Curated annotation (Swiss-Prot):
Name this polypeptide is given: Regulatory protein E2
Bias-annotated ranges (Basic and acidic residues): 163-175
Known role: Plays a role in the initiation of viral DNA replication. A dimer of E2 interacts with a dimer of E1 in order to improve specificity of E1 DNA binding activity. Once the complex recognizes and binds DNA at specific sites, the E2 dimer is removed from DNA. E2 also regulates viral transcription through binding to the E2RE response element (5'-ACCNNNNNNGGT-3') present in multiple copies in the regulatory regions of the viral genome. Activates or represses transcription depending on E2RE's position with regards to proximal promoter elements including the TATA-box.
Keyword Zinc included in the entry's annotation: no
Subcellular location: Host nucleus
UniProt-recorded Gene Ontology molecular function terms: DNA binding; DNA-binding transcription factor activity; nucleotide binding
Length: 382
């Protein structure tokens, strides 16, 4: 704590007025951790549209965070439908996420955020936070209608008028049958009658053939014993089949089977496809060979361990520096105990790659912050 205060005193914000509460250990450890905060403000979140199920959160107007270069930046705290956050450049850093408490205290997974006199509703098109867009400042006055038209969230009043298109849709009367539909119905009736006639004529022909007696059966049995090979049209071939002909037929069949196996796309995968899959196998792959071929595409990953702020800053810089090598970045996360919610160890960050070649190249050129170590691994599903 003393080191943080000395570093803050040497920065450009050391001349600002600070109170004992703002520089206390409890305030620094509160979310967002390891940051100095000013201007606390309470907001309400109502879960399941139940006025009795409301949680009160403390958000901050200004947040001071430390970078890897031991410099301090001052940013405004913001809030949207997903939680409270601040921006590190263009990167959103959420220190409160309402979705976590919605799973604990709610049943429907729906909530409303009440900031002063405004209510933040869920977006219609997407429920995932967009980086750098769709944010609402927590200390701003009631905004203008132009600023409220946001891409990922929308701040609106509680009274809403239903769209007119819905009323027209449900009050629309069914259209009367036209001449086109009448013709189609007649054609369908004629087709059904033709099908019934054909089935009756076919059944009669089968009955007449069955009455033919034993002579036809004997004649057919003789023809079958003489020429067992039949063509496509049901006609017999010339003369009996010899032993040499049967061998040639078996050879041709084996060749056709081998050709069909060789032309199958499941025969193997090219080196370029290794590491291209980012999903685990489904139930359709029952054979062991198919599973091995699919599992060869499992993407490799690197697990980073270190301080949360260092990992976030590294991720922000790595997206620009290693954008051709790293395929996906995860958010920072931590392990918790099996019997408690206390965090265990340092924060984690996962980096996913398309192939082992890209991961090896990344390892050769990567520069990790001090105090951050790494390990290799593979995942069946990203």
């Amino acid at each position: 704590m003393v080191i943080l205060l000395q570093s803050l005193q040497k920065s450009a914000y050391g001349k600002e007025p600070w109170t004992l509460t703002q520089t206390s250990l409890e305030t620094v450890r509160s979310a967002p951790a390891n940051c100095f905060k000013k201007g606390p403000q309470n907001i309400e979140v109502m879960f399941d549209k139940d006025p009795e199920n409301i949680m009160v959160y403390t958000v901050w107007t200004y947040i001071y965070y430390q970078t890897l270069d031991d410099t301090w930046n001052k940013v405004e705290g913001k809030i949207d439908y997903h939680g409270a956050y601040y921006l590190e450049g263009t990167l959103k850093v959420y220190y409160i996420q309402f979705e976590v408490d919605a799973a604990r205290f709610g049943k429907t997974g729906i909530w409303e955020v009440h900031v002063n006199e405004d209510t933040i509703f869920a977006p219609v098109t997407s429920s995932s936070p967009a980086a750098g867009e769709g944010a609402t400042s927590i200390d701003s006055a009631p905004e203008s209608p132009a600023n409220r038209q946001l891409s990922s969230t929308s701040v609106s009043s509680r009274k809403r008028t239903p769209p007119r298109t819905e009323a027209r849709r449900y009050n629309r009367k069914e259209s009367s049958p036209t001449t086109t539909t009448t013709r189609r119905q007649k054609r369908q009736g004629q087709r059904q009658e033709d099908t019934a006639r054909r089935s009756r004529s076919t059944s009669r022909g089968r009955q007449e053939i069955s009455r033919g007696g034993n002579q036809r059966r004997r004649r057919r049995s003789r023809e079958t014993s003489i020429s067992p090979a039949w063509g496509r049209g049901g006609r017999s071939r010339r003369g009996p089949t010899t032993r040499s002909q049967s061998k040639s037929l078996s050879r041709s069949r084996s060749r056709s089977k081998s050709r069909s196996r060789g032309s199958s796309p499941r025969g193997g995968i090219s080196p370029a496809d290794v590491g291209s899959s980012v999903r685990s196998l489904g139930r359709k792959h029952t054979g062991r060979l198919e599973r091995l071929l699919e599992e060869a595409r499992d993407p490799p990953v690197i697990l980073l361990r270190g301080d949360a702020n260092k990992l976030k800053c590294f991720r922000f810089r790595a997206k620009k520096k290693y954008q051709d090598l790293v395929k996906y970045y995860s958010t920072t996360w931590s392990w918790v105990g099996g019997t408690s919610n206390d965090r265990i160890g340092r924060s984690r960050l996962l980096l996913a790659f398309s192939s082992n070649t890209e991961r090896e190249l990344f390892i050769k050129i990567m520069k990790l912050p001090p105090g951050v170590d790494w390990s290799l691994g593979y995942l069946d599903d990203l």
